[in-house]
A protein has these predicted regions:
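N-terminal basic/disordered segments at the start of proteins
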Residues: 2-4, 22-28
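Alpha/beta enzyme core
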Residues: 6-12, 16, 28-53, 61-75, ...
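Short active-site oxyanion
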Residues: 19-22, 79-80
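Catalytic-site beta-strand/loop segments enriched in glycine and acidic/polar residues
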Residues: 23, 177, 202-206, 210
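Glycine-rich beta-to-alpha transition loops that act as phosphate-gripper elements at the mouths
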Residues: 25, 81-87, 207-218
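Cofactor-binding active-site loop characterized by glycine-rich and histidine/acidic residues
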Residues: 58
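C-terminal alpha-helical cap/extension of soluble enzyme domains
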Residues: 217-278
Length: 278
């Protein structure tokens, strides 16, 4: 197999009534582990780099993007590369040269009209440069280390009528929706509003994306896919597996034993969560 456009993986999943898992990576070990997990279950996967991950790497996108691309090229399953939660126009414009075929542009923190205007501009640029683009409408909390709001509070979730208009007016290729999940959850105790998901799936013609999926048990993930979610974003679950393994295998000097354990733990987590979607 090899590196393939992430948007194509989502489109194929949507046509088959399935979902593709998209894992946020921070280190080379993340990328290697996710691909190992996908190979175990024989399913495609997406590697995602967020703007925050790029900031962690001193603002340099190319080194980690090229490493992820090299891992994807050597994979035994189709692997997409996606630039996630982009707010900076400067970073958005680096996507093509860095080898990304898709981006998620995040203006969801803005009021509706401003979100629409910013997203439409980003979508116009993305399409002119051959990129598939995802956007977000609603409040999927827990970003940037912030305490997540009540995901079921009035106004936090995505309105189906607004979603229909937003997609039509912005021209995006996929929409991340707020239906009860939150970013950065370390326990799998969240629950989704499946009635709202059904209304969104009926209202919106593009694939729907679920963010904050680490906090959902397997049954909720499976129900989300059955209800119309076509891309499932996962990040914190990998980090919980990684840091737990590092603590258990920490050595005085040589990093290889604990990084080996961390990679193995993340691969096991990735395989299990990919399988839960199938």
């Amino acid at each position: 197999m090899s590196l393939v456009p992430a948007g194509a993986l989502v489109t194929e999943a949507a046509a088959a009534g399935r979902a593709v898992a998209a894992f946020n990576i921070i280190t080379l070990e993340h990328a290697e582990a996710v691909i190992e997990g996908a190979e175990r279950v024989g399913l495609p996967v997406i590697l995602q780099l967020s703007e925050n991950a790029v900031k962690f790497r001193s603002g340099r996108l190319l080194p980690i993007a090229r490493a992820a691309s090299a891992c994807a090229e050597a994979a035994g399953v189709p692997v997409g590369l996606h630039l996630d939660h982009v707010k900076s126009s400067e970073l958005l414009r680096q996507a093509v040269d860095a080898g990304f075929g898709s981006v998620m542009y995040d203006a969801a923190h803005l009021p509706y009209a401003e979100n629409l205007e910013a997203t439409r501009s980003a979508a116009d640029w993305a399409h002119a440069n051959g990129l598939w683009i995802e956007a977000e409408l609603g409040e999927v909390g827990g970003k940037d280390g912030a305490a997540p709001p009540d995901p079921h509070a009035p106004g936090a979730r995505t309105d189906p009528d607004e979603a229909r208009r937003f997609v039509a007016d912005s021209g995006v290729d996929a929409l991340a929706v707020a239906i009860g999940s939150s970013h950065a959850m370390t326990s799998r105790t969240a629950s989704l509003d499946h009635g709202l998901l059904a209304r969104l799936a009926k209202a919106v013609e593009v694939p729907l994306v679920l963010h904050g999926s680490s906090g959902l048990p397997d049954a909720e993930l499976a129900a989300a896919v059955a209800g119309g979610i076509r891309k499932v974003n996962i990040g914190t679950a990998l980090n919980v597996a990684m840091t737990g393994a590092i603590r258990a295998h920490l050595t005085p000097a040589d990093p290889r034993p604990y990084l080996t354990a961390a990679r193995a733990a993340m691969a096991t987590t990735a395989a299990a969560m990919i399988a839960a979607l199938d």
